[in-house]
Amino acid sequence: MNNDKRPLYIPYAGPALLATPLLNKGSAFSGEERSSFNLEGLLPETTETIQEQVERAYQQYKSFESDMDKHIYLRNIQDTNETLYYRLVQNHISEMMPIIYTPTVGAACENFSNIYRRGRGLFISYPNRDRIDDLLNNAANHNVKVIVVTDGERILGLGDQGIGGMGIPIGKLSLYTACGGISPAYTLPIVLDVGTNNPQRLADPMYMGWRHPRITGPDYDAFVEEFIQAVQRRWPDALIQFEDFAQKNAMPLLERYKDRICCFNDDIQGTAAVTVGSLLAACKAAGTKLSDQRITFLGAGSAGCGIAEAIIAQMVSEGISDEKARSQVYMVDRWGLLQEGMPNLLDFQQRLVQKFDNTKKWENEGNGFSLLDVMHNAKPTILIGVSGAPGLFSEEVIKEMHKHCKRPIVFPLSNPTSRVEATPNDIIRWTNGEALVATGSPFEPVVHEGRSYPIAQCNNSYIFPGIGLGVLAVNAKRVTDEMLMESSRALATCSPLAINGNGALLPPLEEIHLVSKKIAFAVAKKAIEQGVALEITDEALNDAIDQAFWQPVYRRYKRTAF
């Protein structure tokens, strides 16, 4: 924690101190500090508390009308005074999370070069591939423990944004701190600039990235490998989160590195963990098990297949065979249901094809099986959307599902809001209020026939901050599948619906600190059990989590000589 009563000794003074976001207090510098650090005359006379600063900042925030302007304003505070930024965000977490992350961050990525004001993190470009060690040494933060890295090729549902993708690592790490208590001094956002194939970015005179078609194949793999090795040399214990890599790279990179370094892919594993946790809560509330369900996915990319594999693992842990579990999962992409013998499937898709014996008696029109065909024949109880294609959960599809399932569970998870497969309002209306809905982006509660239905945001921010906190608390050397499974189970125990039989599927964001600590404990405990972290007692583990949990409060400063 940073509520340490001991003073912090600072070598900076004057404008240099005010220009250091991690240390700047602005108007909250005391009279003694202003004198010691040559700040007199550089600040207004009044010394304020952080709460007074928050009140002014919130008034200014409310004066902006558009979400983009609010995003830019918050980023400006972050780049000026990080302690104030995180206190403001924590005080208004439900209101501001959609601004600092999805859905607003999508537009911020698309307009990154146009709204750019100040650098944050590292931009590691392919032309500098022989100097990555030097670039890492230039990072503003020296004791880095968590890195979020992207190559900008698959930003949310928006595709290739080049270096504009940097908005995602910045936003994700903001949530590591705001939700998971990881000190911003330990975080580093990175974009690997390997070019872009987005013609709009290449033609934009404002675009600030490397103007070159994307590097691919062996050259790309060698570049990523050199980056990983350089990080290992500089920060050998750092957790690396891969973020928004394209499908063709996301799973291969995860498979290549997950047993070599401490890393995970949030799009694949984090999304899977929060989805499984939400489904476990829904099943508990309904008095059933996940292994009793039939599950259809729309979207068979790395994210969808990652969720499916996590669901299958949970089903198997409940006592059914792997083969039986796979027979209850139906993957649908643009070509229809994935079936054995289909050409051009990727390795991770091959493991999820339906066998002919399971579908030979199905009814359909034309070749293959559409989503509607699957609804009619498989009679799923759960429908999950990770397609990035808006509107594909049509009224006909949802009503067909509802025919065979009184309480359908429908998760349209695609981000941002413009890409959602169906709106909660439509799903609730089409099922006469009987569907249980969770989404990837935030939605207001739905009012149907006089009743209000809370819509859970099945957001990775419920999971990855706790994973990071747990890894840091015990200095875990790997992030294993079992650790991720424990994060899902811990999240499910926090569900108001599962606990009380009513309320929201997931806890309110105002309780995210408690959720993150609970997940951190479960993740760290499993890491110890699996031998990827040193063994400590439960009491010592709780203490380690509390000690690692950073709070946005100002510490006293004392000046030290250079």
Swiss-Prot record:
Transmembrane segments: none
GO BP of this protein: malate metabolic process
Residue numbers binding NAD(+): R154, D267, N415
Enzyme category, top tier: oxidoreductase
InterPro entries referenced in this protein's UniProt entry, alphabetically: Aminoacid_DH-like_N_sf, Malic_enzyme_CS, Malic_N_dom, Malic_N_dom_sf, Malic_NAD-bd, Malic_OxRdtase, NAD(P)-bd_dom_sf, NAD_malic_enz_proteobac
GO MF entry, a single one: NAD binding
PROSITE patterns (UniProt xref): MALIC_ENZYMES
Keywords carried by this UniProt record: Metal-binding, NAD, Oxidoreductase
Active-site residues from the entry: Y101, K172
Residues that coordinate or bind a divalent metal cation: E243, D244, D267
Site (Important for activity): D267
Xref: HAMAP family: NAD_malic_enz (MF_01619)
Family, as annotated: Belongs to the malic enzymes family.
UniProt-listed PANTHER family: MALIC ENZYME-RELATED, NAD-DEPENDENT MALIC ENZYME, MITOCHONDRIAL
Protein name: NAD-dependent malic enzyme
Organismal lineage: Bacteria, Pseudomonadati, Pseudomonadota, Gammaproteobacteria, Vibrionales
Gene field: maeA
